[in-house]
């Protein structure tokens, strides 16, 4: 029999032995504990298991497949990646991969990354005032891995080999050394496989597809110094190049065939710049308006 003893339980157990005048030298401690527990009611307050805590946290962070993509892309950007490739299928419900050429992680760093509240972004509360990264709480990867089957492959510049770690429901299944370039690839499969109540609230594949595509379009417009490649079922949807102008990037993202033209203007302290569509372009739809 295994049980957890804390100071309060030790005190209560000692009180029970004294009150019932039990000769502890003639009876096993486990037998005393059984008698003690038999007379106790089940406590109403108890500590949740770590996997349950992570699954609850996942409900706040992982609302839908696009939220998984968002967290992983932000991690890539925080890792100083210049090329980010995203691939997904079935609205991201069964397969999402995000691969980058960022600084990568060592084996030890991977294992820290899958622990809650482990982060490279801050070390003390004062760091929040100068924070410039997308994330800092260290909750994304452990939350995602608690409700999906996740494979993390990564290598940094200082290591000769990379590391590949497979997880399912937050549990480590395997670890192996691999040959790969510096950077990180994270594959998320079977999202909410162990939380069926969450999966049934996901929308159709097409709706979830659109959320992912819209998200990467927004990232592409905000970070025009990053090359984004977006694939659906291994088929390229769009690809933006590094250091494109806003007009060039809009044309690439929406496949508008040179419909957008760049402009710059300066008047004192005001220097607007952007892109406008050519006069003969009259197609108006929801995706024409992006707020970031």
What residues fall within each predicted segment?
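Serine residues within intrinsically disordered or low-complexity segments
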Residues: 24-25
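Compositionally biased, low-complexity segments
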Residues: 20-21
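Ala/Thr-enriched low-complexity intrinsically disordered regions
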Residues: 14-15, 30
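Compositionally biased, intrinsically disordered low-complexity segments enriched in Pro/Arg/Gln/His
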Residues: 8-9
């Amino acid at each position: 029999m295994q049980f957890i003893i804390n100071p309060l339980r030790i005190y209560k157990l000692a009180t029970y032995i004294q009150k019932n005048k039990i000769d502890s030298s003639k009876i096993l401690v486990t037998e005393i504990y059984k008698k003690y527990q038999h007379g106790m009611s089940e406590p109403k307050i108890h500590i949740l298991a770590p996997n349950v805590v992570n699954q609850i946290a996942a409900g706040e962070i992982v609302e839908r497949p696009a939220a998984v993509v968002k967290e992983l892309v932000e991690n890539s950007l925080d890792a100083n990646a210049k090329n980010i490739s995203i691939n997904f299928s079935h609205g991201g419900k069964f397969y999402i991969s995000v691969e980058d050429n960022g600084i990568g992680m060592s084996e030890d760093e991977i294992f820290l990354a899958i622990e809650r509240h482990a982060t490279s972004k801050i070390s003390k509360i004062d760091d929040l005032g100068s924070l410039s990264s997308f994330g800092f709480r260290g909750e994304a990867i452990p939350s995602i891995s608690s409700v999906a089957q996740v494979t993390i492959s990564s290598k940094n510049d200082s290591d000769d080999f990379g590391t590949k770690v497979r997880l399912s429901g937050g549990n480590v299944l395997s670890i192996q050394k691999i040959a790969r370039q510096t950077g990180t690839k994270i594959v998320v499969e079977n999202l909410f496989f162990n939380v069926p109540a969450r999966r049934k609230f996901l929308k159709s594949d097409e709706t979830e597809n659109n959320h992912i595509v819209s998200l990467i379009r927004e990232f592409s417009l905000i970070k025009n110094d990053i090359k984004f490649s977006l694939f659906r079922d291994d088929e390229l949807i769009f690809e933006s190049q590094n250091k494109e102008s806003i007009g060039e990037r809009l044309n690439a993202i929406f496949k508008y065939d040179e419909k957008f033209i760049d402009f710059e203007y300066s008047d004192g302290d005001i220097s607007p710049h952007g892109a406008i569509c050519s006069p003969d372009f009259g197609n108006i739809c929801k995706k024409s308006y992006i707020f970031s």
